[in-house]
Amino acid sequence: MPQKTEDNNAIFDDDFIKLDLYDEEENKVWYDLEQNGQMIDIAVVPIKEEIEKYILDIEDAEEPFNENVNLNIADEIFVIGFPFGRIGGILPIWKKASVASEPSLDLNDMPYYFADTATKSGMSGSPVVLYEKRPVVIAESLQGKFSKYRTKFVGVYSGRIGANSDNKNDAQLGRVWKVDMVDKIIDQFEK
C-alpha cells in the first residue's frame, strides 16, 4: 500500500510527483481489492491531473504484436524498483528473478505466483517484466523496425516470504501478483 507521509502524500521523488493519498475527510484515494477474505497487496492510485514529467504508459512500452505471453516455470523475469528507497537515482534497479511456481495456478487460493530472487526493502509494488532477447516488431507504423528485446508486464511484486525472519538462509521467494489483478482493481472502482 502507498506510504502516508506527515502531509498525507505519496512522494515518488523530491523532484517528481506528489500525490495525495487521502482526501479532505481523510478517506483513502487509492483502489485496493479483497479476495477470499484477504487483501490483494496491490494499490492503484488514480492520477487525475495531466503529468508531463517522466511518465510512460506501460502499454506504450510493450510491443503491440506480441501480447500473448505464456509465462512458465524458470522463465527469467525482472523486478524493477528502488531497493532501500533511492539506490540508482532517478532510474530504477532491475533485479533478476526466475518464475519459481506454476504461474497459471493460484497459490493458497490467491492470484499470485512465486519468484526466486534476492530482493531487498523498497521493491514492493514494483512492476515485474518478462524481458527476452529476441526480435519483435515495434509498431505497425514502423514496418521493418524491430526491437532486440521483447518486454511484457507480468505482475506486481509485493515482497519476500519470510523477509522479517532472522534466518539468513531463507528461500528468497518473492510474491508476484498476477497482472490481471491490476485491471480487476481498476475495473471494480471505475464502474
Predicted segments with their positions:
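Serine endopeptidase catalytic core focused on the charge-relay Asp
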Residues: 1-110, 116-117, 121, 125, ...
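Short beta->alpha transition motifs characteristic of CBS
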Residues: 81, 153-163
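Low-complexity, polar-biased intrinsically disordered regions enriched in Pro/Ser/Thr/Gly
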Residues: 9, 32-35, 133-147, 162-168
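C-terminal tail/extension regions appended to the core domain(s) of diverse proteins
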Residues: 159-191
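Catalytic nucleophile loop of clan PA
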Residues: 117-156
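Alpha-helix termini
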Residues: 94, 135-139, 191
